[in-house]
Amino acid sequence: MDLSFKPEHETFRDEVRKFLKDELTEELLEAGKLTASVFSEVEFSSKWHKILYKKGWIGASWPEEYGGTGWDDMQRYIFRSECASAGTPSPTAMGLAMVGPVLMKHGTQKQKDFYLPRILSGEDFWCQGYSEPGSGSDLASLQCKAVRDGDHYLVNGTKIWTTH
């Protein structure tokens, strides 16, 4: 098995390194260092997300038909590896890694057309809010309710762990 980079992958790695050098401000690098989990603080995640979106690099694992990069496996590896080495903050991951792929597979065409571009651009922000006092993440015992109130929903309840 040959795991060496092809010349086009070396060129791509150089491009990624230059991009990171040019775009990573001290503020973003500091935010990357302070990341306590897989998620960076929202302010910095959003900034980094928008920089990647402007470059056309936010949808690294999304199919091209939904606005993804069209990168091969090696390019995705190079990009993620270089971002990790550089200490970037994470982009807003919930929409990119969880909501977007579910919509791609199970969403209606109308949902895909509306939400997927907004996830990529960072215009829409998604989060997960499962855990509740006394329930943890046991989804069958959750007490929080959403009730339609005109053209929106009123959500009542308490969450103890929410992530973006």
Model regions: which residues?
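Internal helix-loop-helix
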Residues: 46-123, 164
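N-terminal glycine-rich anion-binding loops that anchor highly charged ligand groups
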Residues: 18-24, 52-54
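Conserved short loop/turn motifs at secondary-structure junctions
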Residues: 32-41, 64-68, 99-105, 131-134
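Short secondary-structure junction/hinge motifs that connect adjacent elements
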Residues: 28-52
